[in-house]
């Protein structure tokens, strides 16, 4: 077999299919990277391992609670793993988060209810909204890019927060691309709080009170701390359940059978 040598390739005169296979196998390594791609790689933090069951904590400040007519004016996002550890900033200094204020004019802000006018005015949010230059579309794209930086795959990140079903209701209309990227389930810390109030009210009474600063960032930090408190003090850790073989082996009684049992007990007296 005779071979012809050329720079960067070897061609077989009688077996050209071998060269085709060789070219395909190495072409992925020989493609030049553009300067734009290199800059993008440098700006995006490299995750060597995927986040463990990531939670996408989001809190929105709105002009009211009418998801049809009111608007999201501030949004904040913190991403944690399933152990509630926040992702780190690109420079390694502190935790990473995304936060932005959307511009609306006086024609929108003056229509807020009294509660929003007072609290958003006192917190300085109203002034930030009027001064902001960012549109809703810009903020949606920025938030989606931020989430995809740490959670590139769709239907992986789970939306989390306090009464986060309300935030999601607004985001379905105003941040549809973000909602489409996230999993359909949510982790609503307020649901655990309502269960604790009924199941163990004495313990729930010792739950640290929220400061209610009503800024998106402070609300998320308090929500994460609140879920951590429940995990430390209310929910059973794995070491307390792994050794209990009977858990889940018995079928729970239906409400009707429980009621019948109580009636039988009462007739025995």
Curated annotation (Swiss-Prot):
- What Enzyme Commission number does this protein have? 3.1.15.-
Q: Where is the composition biased (Low complexity)?
A: 245-261
- By its UniProt entry, which SUPFAM superfamilies does this protein fall under? Ribonuclease H-like
Q: Where in the cell is it found?
A: Mitochondrion
From the UniProt entry, list the residue stretches annotated as the region Disordered: 240-269
TM ranges are none
* Alphabetical GO biological process terms: exonucleolytic trimming to generate mature 3'-end of 5.8S rRNA from tricistronic rRNA transcript (SSU-rRNA, 5.8S rRNA, LSU-rRNA); mitochondrial genome maintenance; U4 snRNA 3'-end processing; U5 snRNA 3'-end processing
Primary localization class, coarse: mitochondrion
Q: Does the keyword Transferase apply?
A: no
Q: Where is the Exonuclease domain?
A: 55-227
Q: Which GO terms describe its molecular function?
A: 3'-5'-RNA exonuclease activity; nucleic acid binding
Catalytic-site annotation from UniProt: 184
For this UniProt record, give its keywords in alphabetical order, as a comma-separated list.
Exonuclease, Hydrolase, Mitochondrion, Nuclease, Transit peptide
Keyword presence, Mitochondrion: yes
Which domain of life does the protein's organism represent? Eukaryota
Gene Ontology CC entries for this record: mitochondrion
Q: What else is known?
A: Present with 1730 molecules/cell in log phase SD medium.
Family the UniProt entry places it in? Belongs to the oligoribonuclease family.
> What biological function has been recorded for the protein in this entry?
3'-to-5' exoribonuclease specific for small oligoribonucleotides.
Q: Which protein are we looking at?
A: Oligoribonuclease, mitochondrial
Source organism (scientific name): Saccharomyces cerevisiae (strain ATCC 204508 / S288c) (Baker's yeast)
For this protein's source organism, the top of the classification is:
Eukaryota, Fungi, Dikarya, Ascomycota, Saccharomycotina
Q: Which gene encodes it?
A: REX2
């Amino acid at each position: 077999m005779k071979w012809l040598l050329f720079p960067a390739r070897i061609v077989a005169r009688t077996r050209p299919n071998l060269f085709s296979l060789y070219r395909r196998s190495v072409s992925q390594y020989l493609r030049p990277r553009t300067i734009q791609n290199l800059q993008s790689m440098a700006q995006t933090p490299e995750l060597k391992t995927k986040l463990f069951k990531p939670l996408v904590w989001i809190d929105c400040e709105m002009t009211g609670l009418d998801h049809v007519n009111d608007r999201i004016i501030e949004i904040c996002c913190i991403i944690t793993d399933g152990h509630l550890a926040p992702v780190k900033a690109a420079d390694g200094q502190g935790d990473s988060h995304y936060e932005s204020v959307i511009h609306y004019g006086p024609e929108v802000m003056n229509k807020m209810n009294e509660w929003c006018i007072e609290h958003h005015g006192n917190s300085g949010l109203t002034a930030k909204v009027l001064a902001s230059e960012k549109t809703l579309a810009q903020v949606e794209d920025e938030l989606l890019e931020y989430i995809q930086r740490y959670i590139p795959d769709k239907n992986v990140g789970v939306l989390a927060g306090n009464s986060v079903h309300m935030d999601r209701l607004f985001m379905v209309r105003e941040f549809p691309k973000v909602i489409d990227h996230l999993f359909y389930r949510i982790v609503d810390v307020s649901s655990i709080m309502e269960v604790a109030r009924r199941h163990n009210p004495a313990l729930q009474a010792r739950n640290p009170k929220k400061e209610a600063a009503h800024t998106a960032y402070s609300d998320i930090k308090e929500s994460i701390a609140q879920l951590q408190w429940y995990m430390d003090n209310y929910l059973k850790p794995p070491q307390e359940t792994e050794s209990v073989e009977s858990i889940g082996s018995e079928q729970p009684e239906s409400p009707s059978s429980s009621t019948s049992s109580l009636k039988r007990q009462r007739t025995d007296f």
